UniProtKB/Swiss-Prot annotation:
UniProt: UTP binding residues: 16-18, 28
EC number: 2.7.7.99
Domain of life of the source: Bacteria
Gene Ontology biological-process annotations: cell wall organization; peptidoglycan biosynthetic process; peptidoglycan turnover; regulation of cell shape
Reaction catalysed by this enzyme: N-acetyl-alpha-D-muramate 1-phosphate + UDP + H(+) = UDP-N-acetyl-alpha-D-muramate + phosphate
Protein name: N-acetylmuramate alpha-1-phosphate uridylyltransferase
Gene3D superfamilies assigned: Spore Coat Polysaccharide Biosynthesis Protein SpsA, Chain A
Assembly and interaction partners: Monomer.
Binding-site list for substrate: 113, 158
The UniProt record lists the keyword Nucleotide-binding: no
Organism: Caulobacter vibrioides (strain ATCC 19089 / CIP 103742 / CB 15)
A GO molecular function held by the record: metal ion binding
Functional summary from the UniProt entry: Catalyzes the formation of UDP-N-acetylmuramate (UDP-MurNAc), a crucial precursor of the bacterial peptidoglycan cell wall, from UTP and MurNAc-alpha-1P. Is likely involved in peptidoglycan recycling as part of a cell wall recycling pathway that bypasses de novo biosynthesis of the peptidoglycan precursor UDP-MurNAc. Is able to complement the fosfomycin sensitivity phenotype of a P.putida mutant lacking murU.
Length: 242
């Protein structure tokens, strides 16, 4: 096992359109689930996995996100926060990482969405991704979950996982058993040749997967995608039962 990344990129620049009206006056990152902002749920998971620095991209209500993160640091809470400013233009997942390359350093990093919450059944899920990471074999390692153990993700799945951990993205019309649940490790330089401006990671992942360079791990637990107000209520109900 290689050393777990100490730096994470936290993707917090989205408009949160599907979360309206909760995002009429705040970004999705600051929507609270069970009394805690979504971004804090994710930052605390990353800190538990020994992440020391989080590079957070901001766009929609950027000032509110920055103020929240400064207040968090003022309380002495880890991790150290570095802002990647996308106020001029939101750059999506791939473009956001490319824009932040100078802030992310040389090694692999965690990349995390802020709208994924989970209840772990056996061990720490982020640690499981770190344990599976092997930079000789892979450029990306995805955290995955069974469609039967996830709420609010794609019912027809995203990927198949081979016995040796290789990811294959489903073809049109296929039903896959696993979904991507919002956390991965990657070599951030995979985005360097992407276009200037916004672009998604997904086409890049698919090209790398075709070359056998994308792996995955499916820890045990219940994963919840908090993408709209109804999903927020469902997540809070599940957390209350845990």
């Amino acid at each position: 096992m290689s050393q777990a990344p100490k730096i994470a990129m936290v993707l917090a620049a989205g408009l949160g359109t599907r979360m309206r009206p909760l995002t009429n006056d705040r970004p999705k990152a600051l929507v609270e689930v069970a009394g805690k902002a979504l971004i804090d749920h994710m930052l605390d998971r990353l800190v538990a996995a020994s992440v020391e620095t989080a590079v957070v991209n901001v766009h929609y209500f950027a000032d509110l996100v920055e103020a929240h993160l400064r207040a968090r640091e003022a309380k002495g809470l880890a991790p150290r926060i570095v802002i990647s400013d996308e106020r001029v233009q939101a750059l999506e997942t791939g473009g956001g990482i490319k824009h932040a390359l100078a802030l992310l350093g040389e090694g692999p990093v965690f990349v995390a969405n802020i709208d994924s919450i989970w209840i772990e059944h056996a061990g720490a899920a982020v640690d499981a991704v770190a344990a599976a990471w092997d930079p000789e074999r892979m450029d990306v390692c995805l955290m995955l979950a069974s469609t039967t153990e996830s709420l609010g993700f794609h019912d027809t799945g995203d990927v198949f996982l081979s016995a040796d951990g290789l990811v294959r993205f489903k073809d049109a019309g296929e039903i896959a058993p696993l979904v991507y649940v919002g956390v991965h490790i990657c070599k951030p330089e995979i985005t360097a040749d992407g276009p200037d401006g916004p672009f998604s990671l997904l086409p890049l992942w698919k090209r790398l997967a075709a070359d056998g360079r994308v792996c995955g791990v499916a820890p045990e637990g219940l994963w919840m995608h908090v993408g709209d107000p109804q999903a927020k209520l469902a997540a809070e109900a599940r957390l209350a039962e845990a």
